[in-house]
Regions:
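Non-catalytic, low-structured ubiquitin/UBL-interacting segments
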Residues: 16
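Intrinsic-disorder/low-complexity accessory segments
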Residues: 19-96
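Sec-dependent N-terminal signal peptides
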Residues: 3-13
Length: 96
């Protein structure tokens, strides 16, 4: 029982500190064309977006906003919510 509670707390903790949304463009992406459409929608709405050319097929990193997450769900685009530490690690991996 304690193990289950610890797992739940870790998962909740990771979500609580999440500040970035990652749209992967590798084989895990369910719809590449619609993912580009989400990126274009984000740009049209004057929101920040980073194109990670050398990471997972040219993934996109965006701020974790409910509007963007909803747009991904509506369009059927795969996405991941990542924490600040993960975002920094990804950016440093690309730079090296």
């Amino acid at each position: 029982m304690k193990i289950l509670i610890n797992i739940i707390l870790v998962l909740i903790g990771n979500y609580a500190f999440a500040s970035k949304l990652l749209i992967p463009m590798d084989q895990s992406q369910s719809n590449h064309l619609k993912a580009y459409g989400v990126a274009f929608w984000v740009l049209e709405n004057d929101l920040e977006i980073k194109w990670l050319l050398n990471y997972r097929g040219g993934s996109f990193m965006l701020p974790n906003a409910k509007e963007i997450e909803s747009e991904c769900v509506i369009r059927g685009v795969s996405y991941e919510i990542i924490a600040d530490a993960q975002a920094i690690a990804i950016e440093s991996e690309i730079l090296s």
